Amino acid sequence: MIGNIYQIEGGYTAQRVGERNLQAVSTVADALPMLLAGAPDITDIETLLEVVDGVLLTGARPNVHPSYFGTEPHPSHEPYDENRDAVARKLTRACIDRGIPAFGVCRGFQERCVAFGSSLHPENRDLPRRIHYRVPRLESGERHPYSEVVFADRHGINLLPGAFLISYLAVRQFAPRSRRCRLRG
């Protein structure tokens, strides 16, 4: 799991990972969750991959920097986390080269796609006929406090016959808990 950079009180930069991700790795994967620094100057990916059985690229608020998929940055699409971008890109490719499973959730899925040449739409709010995936808010404008509301099913997905996921999920339809999706190409 790669840390997500954020500012704490006093302006100090910190890295964190969501409790839901830690619990999923521990209980569902029966594995020991480890936080990987989203800082390329202190992250030794080769050494890390000698001791892990898999990698989870988690979600995060910052967007993948558009320079990775041939689009110009724009202030309305910020924030970006170029340090995490650099670590995730190198880590994703190294996992594939070594045959180590690397699963992506939310931004992590976007990082995997971009690492292998796909592009993203920089902001799905700009797309016609989009589905709104943002975090539910209270009437006051504050983020909804209950995770079962924030991560509730949002829409259905129908897999095409022969889709790769059918062999793993054993279903052709399901409702993911997605909040944003910008993949294209």
Model-based region annotation:
Residues 104, 109:
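Glycine-rich beta-to-alpha active-site loop
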Residues 1-103, 114, 118-121, 125-170, ...:
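N-terminal beta1-alpha1 cap of cysteine-dependent amidohydrolase-like domains
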